[in-house]
């Protein structure tokens, strides 16, 4: 997921992306707990993408729209 592409999305799309990432993180954690997860790097990638989306949502809430 690219930060530039995320910045182009509106608030509703960001919230949908957040829900999708949270579901994906939950599924990956369940797979890891059962010993079925083979690609452990996906957990880190999803966590990073969650942080990006949350950061952009908070920027919009605070009225900052940094386009750079």
From Swiss-Prot:
Tell me yes or no: is Ribosomal protein among this UniProt entry's keywords: yes
Q: Which GO terms describe its biological process?
A: translation
Q: What InterPro entries would the database entry show? A: Ribosomal_uL29, Ribosomal_uL29_sf
Annotated GO CC locations: ribonucleoprotein complex; ribosome
A molecular-function term among this protein's GO annotations: structural constituent of ribosome
Keywords of the record: Ribonucleoprotein, Ribosomal protein
Keyword Nucleus in the entry? The reply is: no
The protein's matches in Gene3D superfamilies, at most eight in alphabetical order, are given as: 6.10.140.1970
As for family, the record states: Belongs to the universal ribosomal protein uL29 family.
Protein's recorded name: Large ribosomal subunit protein uL29
Taxonomic lineage is: Bacteria, Pseudomonadati, Pseudomonadota, Gammaproteobacteria, Enterobacterales
Q: What gene name is listed for this protein?
A: rpmC
